[in-house]
């Protein structure tokens, strides 16, 4: 009897999605041959809700190992709205279950980040056979040491910081580089250290703008005519850290900004007298071909997911723990975020190197 396996990619795109899809497909075909049928769900959970899917064949998975983005398309479908019936009067959960049934799926593989995993857990609790695969450049999925897409994004953000050094030095400027990472600062921490940033500001380490300016001033006194500040998009100051997320987000909206980077740049220029500029690489960090590391990781994850399909182990997500690929229960990781802990060795390394954390 043939197995029918559905695959979807949800949330923001990142390098390695196609490599993971390929890893799943090649491993399934190697194991089951003609006794497996793969169904591509288009545009993430949105396609599962609206019934958009297509039958796929081996040719669809050729030549995609190095390809950025996702051949299945993706859309953001917030978990908080999954049980909300909006103006279109669609019961999203019921619609997803219907598509699963209509497509005659034996299981569904969901590639995505934290929101994707929360919805995957919801579907698992609703009785569907679901397996998750951890995708995010933020590296913040609970229960796994690394997610595919992260290392490529580190390479990209590091190159941005590398290139900013020369223009900062040439113009005697302070450069604030905004790195993606709203709730977790892994990407900023890794790329900041790899790129030689002088100041690294993370969501987990609330900053004091006076300390930031003091760090810039110390460098100037030692003869450095520039400073590089790597700012996570979710960085917050010590006063904001005392508020609930919605409260400080509302205050920022009133002030006309969403991230701290422009405010930091303005304050540094005013307090130090040094010309300050902002660089936001933005979605460049999500784009392009995955690194060799991410291609290997994606292949490991994809092939392991195929093994889970073979043994019919569902309600889990793939993870890397202590250099071993394992499966974590969705209910154990859904809704949790892997933040940079205070005891993180890289924070210690940064401090030893004289890097200011704000």
Predicted feature descriptions by range:
Residues 1-9, 20-104, 115, 237-242, ...:
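A cross-family phosphate/adenosyl-ligand binding-site feature
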Residues 20-24, 114-128, 188:
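Short Gly/Thr/Asp-enriched flexible loops that form oxyanion-binding sites at enzyme active sites
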Residues 8-9, 40-42, 73, 110-112, ...:
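Short beta-strand segments
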Residues 99, 110-112, 120-122, 150-171, ...:
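Accessory alpha-helical/coil subdomains and C-terminal extensions
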Residues 33, 123-147, 154, 202-208:
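Short, acidic/small-residue loops that bind anionic groups at enzyme active sites
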Residues 12-15, 87, 114, 144-152, ...:
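Alpha-helix capping and helix-loop boundary segments enriched in small/acidic/polar residues
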Residues 301-310:
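Flexible loop/turn connectors
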